[in-house]
Amino acid sequence: MRYIKFFKELNNKNVNLVGGKNASIGEMFQELVPIGIKVPDGFAITSEAYWYLLEQGGAKQKIIELLENVDATEIDVLKIRSKQIRELIFGTPFPSDLRDEIFQAYEILSQQYHMKEADVAVRSSATAEDLPDASFAGQQDTYLNIKGKTELIHYIKSCLASLFTDRAISYRASRGFDHLKVALSVGVQKMVRADKGSAGVMFSIDTETGFKDAVFITSAWGLGENVVGGTINPDEFYVFKPTLEQNKRPIIKRQLGNKTQKMVYAPRGSEHPTRNIKTTKKEWQSFSLSDEDVLILAKYAIEIEKHYSKEAKQYRPMDIEWAKDGESGEIFIVQARPETVQSQKSKEESQVFEKFKFKNPNEKKEIILQGRAIGSKIGSGKVRIINDLEHMNSFKEGEILVTDNTDPDWEPCMKKASAVITNRGGRTCHAAIVAREIGVPAIVGVSGATDSLYTGMEITVSCAEGEEGYVYAGIYEHEIERVELSNMQETQTKIYINIGNPEKAFGFSQLPNHGVGLARMEMIILNQIKAHPLALVDLHHKKSVKEKNEIENLMAGYANPKDFFVKKIAEGIGMISAAFYPKPVIVRTSDFKSNEYMRMLGGSSYEPNEENPMLGYRGASRYYSESYNEAFSWECEALALVREEMGLTNMKVMIPFLRTIEEGKKVLEILRKNNLESGKNGLEIYIMCELPVNVILADDFLSLFDGFSIGSNDLTQLTLGVDRDSELVSHVFDERNEAMLKMFKKAIEACKRHNKYCGICGQAPSDYPEVTEFLVKEGITSISLNPDSVIPTWNAVAKLEKELKEHGLTEH
């Protein structure tokens, strides 16, 4: 056949003939199907067929005339001309020989699947589409559940006409593509019955930070167009590549989306071949993929990335669409294309750490809305709410676009915006891809944004605070911090990072670092669990109906309270451990005080009213107590899951506020019973050296544990007898006090005697350069810092070590 190529005949060398999308499907058919990756079969109508059609009745010359002198920024003119061109294409009949070939290929495909008329997806594939430096995200149309020759011909024509929507013309013009040097091929692919299963998009790289070792998967019930088009908030999953390839099960994040609707087949004879129906409560409260499905998809992503990288002779992260057949249970890859944002960063750019931050971080800001952050920038300006494309020309340069959902038709408008906010959408929808590509901060899935905000309102949009994006009332000044990482000198003293929020881990891992010196378990409980641990252990007692309902809503998607707690904690710790892998990540077990636990959901039923919570029921004393030990055993299970199931053996454990040797033995026994034993699979167990007794009896504690991390905050408080929360005596609280320096020195010397680890994770090194200098001179193993202190402290330590070496004074 002259104008038809079956997928098995194609590969990536055929882009000019069948476009990027079809060439890529052919490539997978030839190279990846043989190794077990499933791809639905089909055929491509070549770009030669497109030119053949335009030759009929002088259509090509008429298109040239209509596009002459069109300015892509003149939206009204663009709309009129694009409509005229599409009508021209629709009015041009297919030559009979071309139509006959299409019908013959469709019959062959139908017979292959033992069907009279196969249900197919009809997808556009532009010859300039899906190239590494341009996503063409959604620029041409896709139609699902097309059945029969009449429908097939109609929707193929619709695809060809979609090459001349106003958005597609604008996009090509902005990228310097000649309109009549970009041709369109059409792919016809057997449908996967995802209407009875689920579908979505995955990336073989983290889309926001460029972290290379994670697969990011989005998923929803039904056909995948709702995920791609951003009309729902999908489920999200992250899988860690290195340990997945070691046959571990490293699902390091699960996030339940609301999935309010799903796209299914419409009855035959309907106006449209698909329709959206509401999901049931059970569907939106359940994950749309099982863990097994998530791991299969991640393995597919790794193999696809490896193949395309090998072919390109360079690292090539991929953007992949997938579908799960609800009848057979099989998972199929339906498209794969190069990722177009993170992969295009130059080597020089990757050597620069760039961070957007507020000029006055301590200034109080009112959060009015939040959603999923796209990018890592900050934008501010006046709101412009636009509910439909007809009013797009009212949008002014520098305004903040607020709408229900930005599909690629909005691209000319998005280019002018200082930020974008949508009611609906996930991080892999077309709008998110385009926002990243043009470098505009966007927050998607902000429920009720168009109702809560109003045109003319001044707001600030921040995507610089992790995966959650925040909308603040008012304008707040921001600045950009840029650091040349290539200029950083290596240090002997290890520089670690303190981290409490797993969502920031991928970004923080790009700072110069040797690992994580303090990952705070209690912050993960606070932000991920939100309920008091004992309120989960004891779900059916001591609670109001309201509290019980709130807890059950938090648990949606998980089998029971224990499953929720253990997996959520493991995901948080896993995310941090994966971000810094294989560098050490020291996780401190929970260290909330009774007054802090009391403020959590359901907490008032389980906590005593203490006169002095700072010195009361906290740290190790909780772990073996009759009232709390079951909750602590769940914590231990989560830690064991990270090491054993996820394979993240770089994670180490640290026990806080350990008062006596006897307590130490009790805690070690609980850890052992939960498969956490020093030396087993490289595990090290440290304690916080934060009580004077830890220093006084350092040799005894170090006979039980693998090292110390000095907690300078509590150690200063308890050595100087100062309540660190009291303003009245705050002037006395000073880690530079001579007594404190002696405490630090004794702790370091004890660890050296036992040849064991000694770090510091308190606030002192972040605040006082002279404390850092003292610790380096004493030969401390590591200094763990808040992220904003890492770069200046690193440079100071490197300079100091150089001076010490020159004078022969180094302690290392």
Swiss-Prot record:
Top EC class for this record: transferase
Listed cofactors: Mg(2+)
This enzyme's EC code(s): 2.7.9.2
GO biological process per UniProt: gluconeogenesis
Active site per database record: H430 (tele-phosphohistidine intermediate), C761 (proton donor)
Sequence positions that bind Mg(2+): E690, D714
Reaction equations catalysed: pyruvate + ATP + H2O = phosphoenolpyruvate + AMP + phosphate + 2 H(+)
Domain remark in the UniProt entry: The N-terminal domain contains the ATP/Pi binding site, the central domain the pyrophosphate/phosphate carrier histidine, and the C-terminal domain the pyruvate binding site.
UniProt miscellaneous comment: The reaction takes place in three steps, mediated by a phosphocarrier histidine residue located on the surface of the central domain. The two first partial reactions are catalyzed at an active site located on the N-terminal domain, and the third partial reaction is catalyzed at an active site located on the C-terminal domain. For catalytic turnover, the central domain swivels from the concave surface of the N-terminal domain to that of the C-terminal domain.
Name under which the protein is recorded: Phosphoenolpyruvate synthase
UniProt organism field: Helicobacter pylori (strain ATCC 700392 / 26695) (Campylobacter pylori)
